[in-house]
Structures are given as structure tokens and as C-alpha cells.
Amino acid sequence: MIYQADYYLENGLSDRHAAWPDMPFPYNTVVHSGIYDGDMRDGKGILQPDKSGSFAHELVTLYKITRNERYLVSAQKIADCLASHTTRGDSLHSPLPFRVNAFTGETGHLLSNNSTGEVTASAGYTANWSSTLMLFEELAELDSPHLASYNQAFQVILEWMKAYPLRSNRWGPFFEDIPGWSDTQINAITFAMFILQHRDLFPHWEKDVKGIIDWAHRELGNHEYGRYNVEVMNEQTVYRVPGNSHTSRQSSVELMYASLSGDTTYVTNAIRALNWATYTVDHDGKNRYIRDDIWLTDGYGDYVRHFLRAMAACPVLAPANENHLLFSSSVVSQIRYSGNLIRLETFTPPDELVFRLSRKPSGVKAGGMEIPESLSSGISRWVWDPMERGGLLTISDINVKGAVMIRW
């Protein structure tokens, strides 16, 4: 992560005097140059602001892991630029455009999906703003100097997402290699996950999430593997090919929804689809996208996270004879498993940690202080829920800084 972030920050940002300064370009238009300077389809100088928000959100996470201020400062610069350009939007325009010229500020173009190069529309719309919302949210929590502008941009984008994509299922483009319009599963299902993680902002969150999930199955469900009684997910409307990352993303969100709502409608297929997705990755980690070549980001990036989230939502899927952290409410900077001890450090004292363990621990400490096994609320505590094999350890409301240690 450090290598990737450092390389991009040194070789992929717009000029600080540009109309959109200090923003990461999504593509290297001179393929072997090692310099990111534009958009794969719309050319040199073109940014994708949604990817800038996603990159900055990952930089905040990296800052929390390393405590290196460089990543936080870079994330703040990107957030400042995004916030300054955020507008109200409407049914045809998102609060920030999908493509924009970093130097002139002009909105970029959508091109014909028939590879003619013909400009078909302005690239003023996408619904891939979940990471940007979380960027503003996390920077606000870090008490950033531009707190007010982050909060305002967060609210504007959130209200637009509620008013338009959530109602119309017009999710729009994401991928760099598609010239024109396409509705993408990643935009829709990532927002469904955002809703599940921010239920207080969505009074009808169950209906909202179910609506998105059903749209994805209706529009992008793939039935090629029906003989195995599993439906997997196509990538997008312009490229109706099943993807391992897209399928595992869908499954993880469906399992999160089931865990929080009690509605088990999607569980059986979700688990089968996760199993299907494993067949695209070899024992040594090679990933092969269906009917295509090796796409590294699809197999080594978000794909892995989907399985981690799936196991957190449905712990029975986690290995029963091993010890694993399934969930942390705070970013984990370090974790070590050794013999009769698990030791982890987090950015802030976590409200909740969840482990799948092979056997019940004898004790838990946080910051050197013993934490009691208790069902009482309002105190630091741990609870053991036995399973058929091993069990689930939940540690709650840790209010002291320092390492958490689980021992046997």
C-alpha cells in the first residue's frame, strides 16, 4: 500500500495551479511512461473525480495505519478540491462530473460504445460517490480545518444520491475502458453497502437496500451457471460478463443485509456465489476474469475485502479451526497471531471487535487493563458465543488506548 500510494502521489497528480489541483489522474495515456496523466478514453488531462475520492479515502486509511501525515495532507487536498466543485446536481448531472479536464475545468465526454470515437454526450453523471462520502465523513471526524465545507459537500451528495440514483436506479459509469454510458453493478451495490453502514441516515434502509439488490439481479444477474443452482453477477450493462469481484461484492452485501434485517431471502445464493467466485483464483493467487485475461485489481483488491465482509456478516463461513479477526470498528494498524496470544493495535479505541476463534479465550486486556466477560452494556466487556466448532468473541466499548490482547 505504501509503495502504491507513494508512487501515485509522485507520478500521478494534476498540477497545483490547475483548475482541479492535486488530483490523481486515472490512467497513463503513454502506456509505458509510468506517468498517470489522463483518461483512457477521453485523453490526456482528464480526471475522474469519483476515483479521486476513492483514492483519497484509501489515503486516509493508510494514514491511520502508518500515522504518516503525508497521506492525510494529500487526502485533504483532494477533498478540498472535490468539496469546492460540488454542486446540487439534477437527474442528468451528478454533484461532480464523471470526467473533467483538470486544467480547463470543462466537463469531459462520453464516447460511442461502438468504438467510433464519436462524442455522444457530456460525461456529467455517475453515482459512484460512496467512497467520496466516506472521505468527507472521516476527515470531519479527524477535525480537519475545512470541516464545514466537508460537511456541506457530504450533505449535498447524500441528498442527491437519495433523490436520483436511489429512486431511478440510474447508476451510471465507473470503468476506465468503457467509452460511453453504462449502468454498473459496482456503483449500485457499493451504495447499498454505504446505506447498511449508515442506517441512521436512511429511515427506510431495508426497502432501499432490497430495491438496489433486486435491481442488480434483475438487470445484471447471470444465469449461465444455472446447472449449479447459482446466479452470479455481470459487470455492467455494456459488458454483460460475470465477474468474480462483482459477484463476491453482491454476496457480501446480501449477507450484510440478512444479518442486519433478518431477511434471509438472498443467503443461499449468496453463499453459492461466493463459492463460485473462488474458482477464478488459483492456489497461488492468480486471478482470471471470466473470458478475459488477468485483471490484477479485480483479483487482488476489492475481491479480497468482499470475502472478509462476508465472513464478518456470516461468521459460520470463517474457518472453524483457526483464529481470525472478522470485524473492527477502527482501522487496524497491526495484528499478530502467536501461540496462546492475539495482539492488535488500532487507530482509535474500537467500539467493537469481532473474532472467530477455535476456542474460548481465558482473558482479554486493552491498554494493559483487564476487560471483564460480561453481558452488561455501557462498559468495556467481552462476550463469547459458542458455535458448533469454536465460537465468536465480541469485544465492545473499549475506552482506553493501547494494544488489545486475547490470551488462552
Which residues does each predicted region cover?
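Glycan-recognition and catalytic cores of secretory/periplasmic carbohydrate-active enzymes
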Residues: 1-345
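Non-catalytic C-terminal accessory modules of carbohydrate-active enzymes
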Residues: 301-408
